[in-house]
Amino acid sequence: MKVHKYNTKKYNFRELLEGKYTLDEGYKIIRSKKFIKVWESFILNELTKILDSDKIVMQKLPSIRMHPNHTYRNDSLSDSIEATSNGRNKWDNMHKDSDEPYYHPKFDMNFWLPLIDVSTENTMYLETSPNNYEPALLKYGEFLEFKGNSMNHGAQIYNSTEDFRTSLDFRGCAFNDYDESILGDMPIFVDGRENLTQKKWFVIDEYYSLYER
């Protein structure tokens, strides 16, 4: 795992997403020309350095995760629901990205970018050794690099803080590590799409874009 810093004025993701409290609102912004311009600059200027390559393969647009204050999460992907009960398993959304039904390829590197200072009560946790979960205690302006295919990770189910946590996550690799030959025919789940397999989805011009500096 590595923590990286970025310029929040130059890459003003929080400003662009401010006041957006549902996934639909957030993704509308992320698909906008204004956001895409900032995103592509971030990829070309920052991620190429981190991946040590002038040619990289990166998720076209980031995924959004939202965890409102004083709420339980429905699951690891969706908006949260209001807390109505106690005693739920706080780790029941722990997963590896290689797990069924997502089957992310092993060449992916994960990046997680929260848009607030996070705490032990609203951050992502990573299983650094069996049954040992460590919080990613990042400040605004930092983002985490980790290998999500081999490491269990996820948020606690309940956000007990006063802070609404929005975060971006995205995956990619240096072009030299991108290898379509390892992709298989296993069916995968993609919201709004049908009949997709790993080798049809995790390729350039579908899930990924090719960036060259």
Go through the PLM ranges and name each one.
Residues 1-13:
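Glycine/small-residue-rich interface belts in oligomeric ring/scaffold proteins
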Residues 68, 115, 128, 172-174:
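Residue-level signal for short segments within beta-strands and strand-turn junctions
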Residues 73, 120-122, 177-179:
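Intrinsically disordered, low-complexity acidic/polar segments
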Residues 14-100, 104-106:
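Signature of the catalytic double-stranded beta-helix
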Residues 62, 111-113, 168-172:
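A structural signal for short, well-ordered beta-strand segments
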Residues 130-213:
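Catalytic core of Fe(II)/2-oxoglutarate
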